[in-house]
């Protein structure tokens, strides 16, 4: 799955997530930059496992905790 930075403000960050790297089907997750545990799905990807949105929220929360806001990021199933 790939992530692409969509929006970064003083309050939150939003990333698009692309399950299976399919650019035609994406979701959007938002994470609070001060409290990374505050996170939710703005838009869900269609016809894919809900695990993708969970993985996207966890990955973006980890980036926020590390103070990292890359333009793109990737994560794989462990």
Show which residues each predicted segment covers.
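N-terminal acidic leader/helix
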Residues: 3-32
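Acidic, low-complexity intrinsically disordered segments
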Residues: 28-78
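A broad, low-specificity signal for short, low-complexity segments enriched in glycine/proline
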Residues: 1-2, 50
């Amino acid at each position: 799955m790939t992530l692409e930075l969509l929006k970064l403000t003083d309050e939150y960050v939003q990333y698009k997530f692309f399950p299976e790297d399919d650019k035609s089907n994406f979701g959007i997750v938002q994470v609070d930059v001060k409290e990374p545990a505050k996170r939710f799905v703005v838009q869900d990807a269609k016809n894919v496992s809900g695990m993708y949105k969970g993985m996207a929220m966890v990955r973006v929360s980890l980036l926020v905790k590390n103070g990292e806001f890359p333009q793109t990021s990737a994560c794989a199933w462990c």
